[in-house]
């Protein structure tokens, strides 16, 4: 009986950790050779903006140096990166890189390596980087500008402003997010970060992970980081207490870290003001629940608080969240 149960568990684990090495039927294939297109942008340009059917792009192994803009579509979009294990970003085989700084364009969004305006889009197993680095200041890897967007087992890397979670309901699951300054930021999105690995870089003497820009009580914006990890990126020597969980870009900022493991890179205060001249702390919602590790130890800033129970994904995203979220990535 024990052997039978063990065999069933191992079978289930194997099934969950499936590879995705071939394109599904009907997908537009991007490949260095032999595909429908040799750039991701060309594949996106081939999408119908009027069809209400689900469209799929499959990207084969390789490094693609380009800025990708996905416009608003009438139907759902699925983008798959080739991978040996769909459950983890560590097996991703597709890298999308570009280097644009804010100084070169009109706004933050235009610096992003991936600019996604497609509502109802699901992005799987892509490594997306803005390689501009510290000297460029604001330089995004991903700009998420629509609702019902899901990012699964992806990897986002940058320095400042890595991820702009800007509009609508969004999910980031099993995803690696790396940066140094305000690298999860935005104004209006309700975003659920599920089992993400958040990694900080050496360089700044003091910096924050999140910068939520909710500017009024009526705005829906809320970032919830759930069952995730916070630590220094591999190869980075980050001093104890260098980082804060967040600072308020606007005066009604809302961020929650819950059931998340934190190393000592997090300052004991947990949260910090926007600046000494503009603290923006009077109306913030900076909360935690059940965090662990040295970085979870206080005393915390007096404008933050501890919840008595965790926020649920259904409260944040609505009772119909399972209609658009890939629940196989949500435990």
Swiss-Prot record:
Pfam families (UniProt xref): Pectinesterase
Catalytic activity reported: [(1->4)-alpha-D-galacturonosyl methyl ester](n) + n H2O = [(1->4)-alpha-D-galacturonosyl](n) + n methanol + n H(+)
EC numbers: 3.1.1.11
InterPro entries: Pectin_lyas_fold (IPR012334), Pectin_lyase_fold/virulence (IPR011050), Pectinesterase_Asp_AS (IPR033131), Pectinesterase_cat (IPR000070), Pectinesterase_Tyr_AS (IPR018040)
Record-linked PROSITE patterns: PECTINESTERASE_1, PECTINESTERASE_2
One of the record's GO cellular component terms: extracellular region
A GO BP entry: cell wall modification
Protein name (database record): Pectinesterase
Species assigned in the record: Aspergillus niger
Name of the gene encoding the protein in the UniProt record: pme1
């Amino acid at each position: 009986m024990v052997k039978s149960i063990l065999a069933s568990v191992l079978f289930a684990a194997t099934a969950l950790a499936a590879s995705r090495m071939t394109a599904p039927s009907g997908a537009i294939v991007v490949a260095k050779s032999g595909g429908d297109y040799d750039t991701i942008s060309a594949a996106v340009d081939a999408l119908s903006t009027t069809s209400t059917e689900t469209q799929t792009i499959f990207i084969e192994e390789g490094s693609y140096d380009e800025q990708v803009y996905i416009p608003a579509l009438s139907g759902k979009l699925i983008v798959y990166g080739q991978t040996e294990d769909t459950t983890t970003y560590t097996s991703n085989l597709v890298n999308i890189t570009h280097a644009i700084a804010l100084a070169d364009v009109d706004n933050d969004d235009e610096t992003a390596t991936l600019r996604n305006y497609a509502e109802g889009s699901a992005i799987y197993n892509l490594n997306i980087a803005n390689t501009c680095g510290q000297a460029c200041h604001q330089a995004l890897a991903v700009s998420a500008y629509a609702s019902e967007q899901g990012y699964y087992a992806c990897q986002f890397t940058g320095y400042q402003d890595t991820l702009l979670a800007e509009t609508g309901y969004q999910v980031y699951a099993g995803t690696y997010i790396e940066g140094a300054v305000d690298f999860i930021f935005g104004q209006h999105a309700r975003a659920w970060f599920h089992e993400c690995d958040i990694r900080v870089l050496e360089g700044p003497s003091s910096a924050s992970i999140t910068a939520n820009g909710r500017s009024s009580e009526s705005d829906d914006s809320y970032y919830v980081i759930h069952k995730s990890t916070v630590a220094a990126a591999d190869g980075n020597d980050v001093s104890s207490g260098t980082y804060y969980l967040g600072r308020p870009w606007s005066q009604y900022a809302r961020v929650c870290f819950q059931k998340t493991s934190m190393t000592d890179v997090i300052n004991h205060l947990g949260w910090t003001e926007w600046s000494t001249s503009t603290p923006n702390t009077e109306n913030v919602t900076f909360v935690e629940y059940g965090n662990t590790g040295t970085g979870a130890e206080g005393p915390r800033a007096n404008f933050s608080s501890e919840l008595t129970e965790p926020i649920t994904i259904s409260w944040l995203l609505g009772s119909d969240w399972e209609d658009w979220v890939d629940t196989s990535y949500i435990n």
